[in-house]
Amino acid sequence: MYVVDAIRKEPYRDPANGNYIWRPPYPKSKPRERPVRPSSRGDFDHPRPGSRLFSAATAYASVRCVLDIWEFYLGRRLSLVGKSGQRKFEIIPRVTALGDNAWSGEWYIELGFADRNPRKPYCENLDVIAHEVGHIILKHVIGPTPKGRLEFERKSHDEAGADLVSLVSILHFDRVVDAVLERTRGKLFSVNILSQIGEYRMGWSGRRAARLLFQNKTMRSVAHARRAGDKYVYARPLLGAAFDILVEIYEARLVGRGLIPKELANRSTHATARGHPAIRREFAAQFKANPDGFADALREATADFARLLATAWRMARRTGVTFSRVASNIAAADARLNRGRYGETIHRAFARRGITVRVGRS
């Protein structure tokens, strides 16, 4: 894996439609900035924020971080270059011509700028990078996208899956955990930092994505998206169900630690903080008494959730991908890893969205 800080580079794919114009590797004859070198101490602490060196170092560190996290949960190393013959994965941190976008392929990731603003490079946004790396992880773990009737649902699943890769990755940072809990006072069934993961430019449309993880979309309510070919909107029920599962696992961990009573967790399920202020006040009082315990519960829930996803995606290489099959794989993963500890939560979350969990699928 290496960074190429290319100068005046044209995107590998057409920003208008996503079709490939040319492919990596970036030719050595084309202009580029000098590579970042370690200090005499062997670290990379010296690049100044706002500089191209900082962007390059940050992009590399972010990709490596996401891979390290998910290789741990998957239990194996991931090769990023496939069978292309290209020996190294290429990271291009600043591609102005890409505009307000970021994308990845079998051999590379290249990143543009939020609002086309050169002061807002996506290469310094871990959410964006983790989402793009998520696409690569899913392709390597599950396999290539099939052609035919299952193609659309697989692509839609991968948009949700890439956001979940980002969600889990970001929750490995203590500052994020602390900030989320401080802002929500421990009640995560709400619109917050976590529930807005993946909310950046959507595909090639240039429209701001509204992919809130905390929402009530069902398969019936997004049926029009399938007819319109909108994989982002169609993914919302799957994404919302997965977020519900994470939060309910977190609340189960709080109950197990004696930090909240079980009846509060039961009342909290998908109840908004704004619509149910009494529940928020109860959470706030419990959180104030032991914020560190809440943080530990969220870390434990994140690990449980990531293991379920990793196991379900490994199964999907054999079962194939539909929303129902992936939901069933998550239930089967829980039976295998946790003896069905979260089975009721998983079935309820997917049933609420109109996604069928088939008992016994593994």
Please report, for each region that a protein language model flagged, where it lies by residue.
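Zinc-dependent metallohydrolase catalytic domains
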Residues: 53-56, 60-108, 112-126, 138-362
